[in-house]
Amino acid sequence: MGVKGLNQLIKEHSPSAYKEFQLKNLFGRKVAIDASMCLYQFLIAVRQSDGQQLTNEDGETTSHLSGMFYRTIKMVENNIKPVYVFDGKPPVLKGGELEKRLLRREEAQKQKTALGDEGTVEEVLKFEKRLVRVTREQNEEAKKLLELMGIPCVDAPCEAEAQCAELARGGKVYAAASEDMDTLCYEPPFLLRHLTFSEARKMPIDQIEYKDAIAGLDMTKEQFIDLCILLGCDYCESIKGIGQATAFKLIKEHGSLDNIVEWIKNNKTKYTLPENWPYDEARQLFMNPEVTNANEISLKWKEPDVDGLIEFMVRQKGFSEDRIRSGAEKLKKGLKGGVQGRLDGFFKVVKNDDKKRKADPKETKSSKKKRR
């Protein structure tokens, strides 16, 4: 679900934290990607001309494999080294959000069934996309594909976006990539959004710098997390009637979520706290996420296993052999050279003074002549 309204708040108060650029501008970077999120995107976006998901002759869905294969190759061609991080066991506190998602899918199924044969193609597709979920089998297939491609995978003990942020904080990668804005609660130096979107969507990649974001909001790490909880996150519901502007204002006025809760309890306000609201437990999940220390993780990009790719993608999943071989060659070429260094990795940027540097009063005319 992410954090409702956080994107707009950062854009309003911390515009310098945002940058937009194309995939090629990430050349020379290593990036940790929330795998579950991008698999979900591929299942929704990678479709046939009639809007149906890609399937093989046996009727098995292959949209997730197609999206993962070709988008990863595109990154490697641009001299980017991706590492995919998969979700582990969800926190107990997330159970409520997962139950809501299940109920939404059940409702979408009912609405789709009610359409019968009278629904338009667009109406049917709308409900089909709401029914999409990433299965355990699809996760395992994606891991197998990435292993054959020579791309490293990491199994997070809990939330994938928290592990992505840990890899970025630990210097293993440049940034965490996810569509979930709550990734910022785990303090990655940079958050990348839209990284795995299809080029056909023509959406630039958004980069949000964490340090600039909270500086512009003029908040501490703890206040930023409280703001995200107040806006509504995966771990607990929001307070009815409190939108992004009000949430920001309340954090500024009261300083913390604890003080806001006390203020609501002790004053006649129009706000009602949810029953047994676990905001402090949610805060602890953001403050102390269950992750594997970055120093304990070794990331290695290897040459693709072409024979293995042909066996899995062509013989088992029904993809074109020519296309898989062509993709494997692109991977070989991209991974063989390693990540080229970026210029900003060799030079320190020094700001120029606004005024022209005045000549040293001790400097003699003769010394000026010698320099000419």
Swiss-Prot record:
Question: Record's InterPro entries?
Answer: 5-3_exonuclease_C_sf, Flap_endonuc, HhH2, PIN-like_dom_sf, XPG-I_dom, XPG/Rad2, XPG_CS, XPG_DNA_repair_N
- Which residues take part in binding DNA? 47, 71, 159, 232, 234
Q: Which CDD domains match?
A: H3TH_FEN1-Euk, PIN_FEN1
| Protein modification | Phosphorylated. Phosphorylation upon DNA damage induces relocalization to the nuclear plasma.
Region I-domain, residue ranges: 123-254
| Residues annotated as binding Mg(2+) 1 | 34, 87, 159, 161
- Report the Gene3D superfamilies cross-referenced here: 5' to 3' exonuclease, C-terminal subdomain, 5'-nuclease
Give cofactor(s), names only: Mg(2+)
Name of the protein this chain belongs to: Flap endonuclease 1
Gene source species: Candida dubliniensis (strain CD36 / ATCC MYA-646 / CBS 7987 / NCPF 3949 / NRRL Y-17841) (Yeast)
